[in-house]
Amino acid sequence: MLTLASKLKREEGVRAGRTPAGSNDAAHRVSIRDRLLIKEVAELEANLPSTCKVTFPDENKLCHFQLAISPDEGYYLGGKFQFEIEVPEAYNMVPPKVKCLTRIWHPNIAETGEICLSLLREHSIDGTGWAPTRTLKDVVWGLNSLFTDLLNFDDPLNIDAAEHHLRDKEDFRNKVQDFIKNYAR
């Protein structure tokens, strides 16, 4: 993280002294994103839920990281669920792209890894979608809440999981535990 901050300061100095007047907008957007990420990653690390762990495969690339969530209550207790988070160049005007890497039986997470969480949507009917005022902390806390208070059986992405819960809660719990045993340890 400190390496990236130093690199940004160096690049800013080079740009100020030697960049011609029509500088590349994409490079400027990346720079804005990276500046935001330096601040947001520090805030995230200071306010990370106890059930979450963030890792950066490349500490110089804050735009790509992994999140591990180990719920401490509910159906998913005992599991460790991995998510990949990619922050696009147009951040914070668009939300990060998130995928669940762990196979899971969950009404709001498809077995293919897609996630139904309103704050990850660019546009949402209920007004709770992405806004430039949201941060990585909101994303991580939202993902963490999918295992507790945001677990939503009424508006599912995985309809089979939601219907399974409606039909037989105990069998649903057993299937969740089978998935944890087989994929989430």
Swiss-Prot record:
Ranges for region Interaction with uba3: 1-29
InterPro entries xrefs: Ub_conjugating_enzyme, UBQ-conjugat_E2_core, UBQ-conjugating_AS, UBQ-conjugating_enzyme/RWD
Pfam families: UQ_con
Keyword set, alphabetical order: ATP-binding, Nucleotide-binding, Transferase, Ubl conjugation pathway
Domain of life: Eukaryota
Catalytic site: C116
The UBC core domain, residue ranges: 32-185
Recorded GO CC terms: cytosol; nucleus
Function: Accepts the ubiquitin-like protein NEDD8 from the UBA3-NAE1 E1 complex and catalyzes its covalent attachment to other proteins. Together with the E3 ubiquitin ligase rnf7/rbx2, specifically neddylates cullin-5 (cul5). Does not neddylate cul1, cul2, cul3, cul4a or cul4b.
Sequence similarity: Belongs to the ubiquitin-conjugating enzyme family. UBE2F subfamily.
Protein name (Swiss-Prot/TrEMBL): NEDD8-conjugating enzyme UBE2F
Organism name: Danio rerio (Zebrafish)
Lineage: Eukaryota, Metazoa, Chordata, Craniata, Vertebrata
Gene: ube2f
